């Protein structure tokens, strides 16, 4: 908190790894930040059980939640669960947290038009004002698929704009 005053910071963003693996740390820091009138931002995969998520939400001012795809099969490939992430996005929107969603498009995995249309429609059912960031994938670590063509990102963004007002292309 002392450094914040020197730097003029308005709060803390928990990001660049999955912050919720340290749930108690994030919760305790967010509580302290809230007590001092500072903002808490989460950049998360949104994969957390409902009860701790609901306990954390009143302490969070904004969240960017990864919606990694829109099929159960894709989430199984990732060893996650689509319905848990969708529920957590919905709950965050319902409590009035500023929510933005990011989808990293991976060629041959989650780059289908039908999936993006379903995702955009579902997000718009929560709010057509919900920002969606559609990001381009680049090969890293063990996943050696080719990078997402820029044209694919722009095409999927154009599809999403049929339902959402704020769609942004990333990593292009």
Locate each region found by the language model.
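C-terminal accessory regions of radical SAM enzymes
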Residues: 114, 154-172
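Conserved AdoMet/S-adenosylmethionine-binding subsite of the radical SAM
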Residues: 1-148, 156
